[in-house]
Amino acid sequence: MQVIRLEALSDNYIFLLYDDKRNIAAVVDPAEAQPVLKKLAELKADLVAIFNTHHHNDHVGGNKQLIEKFPQLIVYGGAEDRGRIPGQKVFLQQGDRVEFADRIAEVIFVPGHTRAHIAYYFPPQEASETGDLFCGDTLFSGGCGRLFEGTPTQMVDSLSKLRSLPDNTRIWCAHEYTLKNLQFALTVDGDNADLQRRFNEVKAYRSRGEATIPSLLGVEKHTNPFLRWDQASLQSTVKSSDGVQTFARIREMKNNF
């Protein structure tokens, strides 16, 4: 399975999953249809599935046009998003599985950004390979999504699920927010040498117009403050010994950054 990153809107990424054996594709969170249709035409491939992580328009905006072009495709989304995702036919819950290109993705229920948010995790097929996590707006490179419908407790639980995955998991999040996220991270975790190094690397990438997605989960664990709510240095910064409260205070600081 090949993952093809497509740019959309101002800072969105759409991920096209391509099965070159069968010349078919699936797409994760099509913010708009045109970039997907253009790449499918180049590949001369059929689209068989849409994997939506949540209902926000910058993740489902292309659904209707893609369904019109490929009426047999199947739209997957979270069970609690029923009625909110255009064309949804499959309603997924924690622990469900979906198959594409001889790989099986595990569905992880990750409420917080929205009440129905899910992520798709494709474990590696071989020990030497990477897994692939399509996490929408739950976990970002260097950050996490705002809490529009969920609570800090829910988000910490959701991020705990993602944090437990292997370090070599590739993080395919839906926005190019890394540089600004790390600028904020330095304000709450400025003595973190790993974070300082990463910020300089990302700054160089973006100066060359290069994407920072995918990230690796192992890197996130050491540099993303929203996965480090139980670290003493961050708890000291926000003056709390409680993990959820630490997360909530950091999230509020980021909202106002």
From Swiss-Prot:
| Keyword presence, Cytoplasm | no
EC numbers: 3.1.2.6
Against InterPro entries, the record matches this protein to:
Clx_II_MBL, Glyoxalase_II_hydrolase, HAGH_C, Hydroxyacylglutathione_Hdrlase, Metallo-B-lactamas, RibonucZ/Hydroxyglut_hydro
Q: What SMART domains does the database record attribute to this sequence?
A: Lactamase_B
Keyword tags? Hydrolase, Metal-binding, Zinc
Alphabetized Pfam families for the sequence: HAGH_C, Lactamase_B
Recall the GO molecular function terms of this protein's record: hydroxyacylglutathione hydrolase activity; metal ion binding
Q: Does the keyword Lyase apply?
A: no
GO annotation, biological process? methylglyoxal catabolic process to D-lactate via S-lactoyl-glutathione
Required co-factor(s) are: Zn(2+)
Q: What does this protein do?
A: Thiolesterase that catalyzes the hydrolysis of S-D-lactoyl-glutathione to form glutathione and D-lactic acid.
What is the protein named? Answer: Hydroxyacylglutathione hydrolase
What organism does the record attribute this protein to?
Answer: Nostoc punctiforme (strain ATCC 29133 / PCC 73102)
Task: From the UniProt record, report the name of the gene that encodes this protein.
Answer: gloB
